[in-house]
């Protein structure tokens, strides 16, 4: 008993440390490293999936990228299973960070499960599944939506595949659950977004000219970034600020047009969504199917034996 109590205490301590490190990562590291934050959606939207089927992460991560989901076709009630979200991207990709420097990409994901499905508790995980999901802090989208799970930001180089341990409901105990085929929706993003929840643009955007005219001077700032001095076609001076880290593709003396791209597109990330289906299978139905197949095979065997017997009788009668 003392050994079990000690193990439980150690597990709780590890969980608490993981939670604390995740919070510190969000508060301290994240603003400079990545905006792959499902937490932004949690703060701004009651549900991450709009009526149109669009997942709200796409409102900030404007580039479209692929995401894959792997889940079993069918599961039994009160069973733990894996759902794998794959977020691929180029190994050599480096993104522009909030301070203008270059860094690796972080990833985040949201999994929208059917009602009744939820994150599997730690005491239901197998040793193998515990090993696969260690150092991952997966949480419900809200206290009222335990079927919606989010994770992120986490380093993308080690987490291109994120395993979600899921517990299926038991219709015998949960009257809201039924043996049925259900959809699972998933969204996954890599890298920083282009728009903050406030509506402001990040520095991870293509910069367009704010006026038509001639570039008189490109002034480099000490803390990074530029000021592009444009003499507009109306002979007025327009000074356009360029955030740190953005690479210009125009030069002094060049004539530009309004809304013309004057920088390279720094974004190497993006968001994608996908879906699959899963069947909550009744054990009684499986037993019934097994019994049906057994009876069918048995009937076939008796039919063949009866046919053989009939053929022998016919052959004997012909000999007489």
Curated annotation (Swiss-Prot):
Cofactor(s) this protein cannot do without: heme
GO process annotations (BP): photosynthesis
Cofactor note: Binds 1 heme group covalently.
PROSITE patterns with a match to the protein in the record: CYTF
Any one of the GO CC terms: chloroplast thylakoid membrane
Keywords: Chloroplast, Electron transport, Heme, Iron, Membrane, Metal-binding, Photosynthesis, Plastid, Signal, Thylakoid, Transmembrane, Transmembrane helix, Transport
Keyword Transport on entry: yes
Disulfide bonds: none
Localization (cell): Plastid, Chloroplast thylakoid membrane
GO molecular function, one term: electron transfer activity
Function of the protein: Component of the cytochrome b6-f complex, which mediates electron transfer between photosystem II (PSII) and photosystem I (PSI), cyclic electron flow around PSI, and state transitions.
Protein family according to the UniProt entry: Belongs to the cytochrome f family.
Protein name from the UniProt record: Cytochrome f
